[in-house]
Amino acid sequence: MYRQHEHQSTSAECGCKKGAVNSENNQFIGVSHGGKTTKIHAVVDALGNPVHFLLTAGNIFDASAAIDLLSGVNISGSNILGDKAYGAKSIRAYIAEQGASYTIPPKSNVVEPWFCDFHTYKERHLIECFFNKLKVFRRVATRYDKLAVSFLAFVHLASIWILLK
């Protein structure tokens, strides 16, 4: 039987410096109502095929990652569909600067509402269908991976599997 010294600790700290590559700060784990979670932000094409991914902590607002997500993809000449959370003026301005159009419905309390083609907006179900296909993979749905790099790698593998089906 192995016994520890009385002052020896089995601390949960990893001994890493703050901001280090493998520290808790960089693993995109945020505390929200459902517990510790990670959000997967995705861009899909017109057929619902995945194009680009981004991870954030679960307590981060979706719109704060939108410009970073869209900057990873060439969006010129395309129509960006998004829900009401992505209707911020800065996001709409970024999309217009890139030479793309947007179909994002305004919130009910917005001061200056803009036009939204709801017939085109119905195509937004493609991203929801993609996430339903992605959540079939239990490892993605429950995040078994400690490191964000490993989790994102498996999200990519699951996306490849979805594309091959």
Question: Which residues are covered by each model-predicted region?
Answer:
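Polybasic low-complexity intrinsically disordered regions
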Residues: 1-107, 158-159
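Mature extracytoplasmic/luminal segments of secretory-pathway proteins
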Residues: 11-13, 113, 126
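Short, charged, surface-exposed secondary-structure boundary motifs
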Residues: 64, 111-117
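Short hydrophobic "helix-edge" motifs at membrane interfaces and signal-peptide entry regions
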Residues: 73-74, 117-119
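Basic, amphipathic alpha-helical segments enriched in Lys/Arg and hydrophobic/aromatic residues
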Residues: 93, 98-101, 109, 118-165
